[in-house]
Design a protein with these regions (language model features):
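Extended hydrophobic/aromatic segments used for targeting, binding, or gating
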Residues: 188-195
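Glycine-rich loop/linker segments at domain edges
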Residues: 48-150
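Beta-strand segments within the central parallel beta-sheet cores of soluble alpha/beta enzyme folds
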Residues: 1-2, 28-37, 64-69, 163-172, ...
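Phosphate/diphosphate-binding loops
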Residues: 24-77, 205-210, 214-220
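Alpha-helical support elements that line or immediately flank enzyme active sites
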Residues: 1-28, 83-109, 135-175, 179, ...
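Generic recognition of flexible, low-complexity loop/linker segments
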Residues: 20, 52-54, 153, 196-200, ...
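Glycine-rich beta-alpha junction loops
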Residues: 70-74, 115, 173, 214-216, ...
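Amphipathic, positively biased hydrophobic alpha-helical segments used for protein targeting
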Residues: 15-19, 38, 72, 195, ...
């Protein structure tokens, strides 16, 4: 009764449920094992999220207010669990009444005034889509982290400040996050400067980016180096440097 291992509560136990139904039909134990391509073809998808971020900056360039709002659709469920078999016998999915959290909204930064909240978008007719929805791993931190870290870069760019040095201003209380930020920057040979660089004259533009994330007492910093072909818009990731502090491993 093994699934192919789509972690983070994504597989929704389809394989065990299939095995239970089949074994009752034939009166014998039945093993069901999905291959990874099958899992990814039928797995639940992450519900849509909308991230809205605002910040207040004083005359000295200090962030004095941070306002983060996550809005998302709920997960769907049929007969208690969003199983494929439920849909195939005609049961309609029901929308769960909970958000997918707020983590990833920039809480590890020490802003003087900070608000990070999540709101649920009512989903009156979840049966109108053929897609099941569930955690997109984390469960919603991916979108929130992308939004908060991208916005930190936008503020740094607006102030003409290096993105690493800008983040360090608000991490003096957070030793572990400061250390992964510096470790990733040093290992990638990060050079302090405001972003972006002036436009280049060649056919390829180069860029870099840095981002931070935390989850379950784990702290991560990552630097990405990319190239963009100006004519086609094709993006190539040249290198990613990651500093990972996972804390105590038991």
């Amino acid at each position: 009764m093994e699934g192919s291992g789509c972690y983070g509560r994504l597989s929704t136990d389809d394989a065990p449920e299939d095995a239970a139904v089949l074994s009752r039909a034939v009166g014998k134990p039945v093993r069901v094992q999905w291959m990874r391509d099958e899992e990814h073809a039928w797995e639940p998808k992450g519900p849509a999220q909308l991230e809205m971020v605002r910040a207040g900056v004083d005359a000295q360039g200090k962030v004095v207010a941070w306002d983060f709002m996550d809005r998302s659709f709920p997960w769907t469920a049929a007969a208690g669990m969003p199983l494929l078999a439920s849909r195939q016998v005609g049961l309609k999915p029901k929308a769960q009444g909970n958000t997918n959290g707020t983590q990833g909204g920039g809480q590890f930064y020490s802003f003087e005034n900070q608000k990070v909240v999540a709101a649920l978008i009512p989903w009156v007719h979840p049966d109108e889509t053929p897609l099941r929805t569930s955690n997109l791993r984390s469960p919603g931190d991916l979108a929130r982290t992308f939004a908060s870290e991208s916005f930190m870069d936008e503020i740094a760019t607006g102030l003409g400040v290096d993105p690493v040095q800008f983040r360090l201003r608000y991490l003096s209380h957070n030793k572990r996050m400061s250390e992964v930020l510096l470790a990733a920057a040093n290992k990638s040979q990060w050079k302090d400067r405001p972003s972006p660089l002036p436009a280049s004259s060649g056919s390829v533009a180069t860029g870099r980016g840095i981002a931070l994330a935390d989850r379950g007492n784990t702290y991560v910093g990552a630097v990405a180096e990319v190239e963009v072909e100006k004519a086609s818009g094709n993006v190539r990731v040249k290198r990613i440097t990651i500093a990972h502090d996972c804390g105590l491993i038991v």
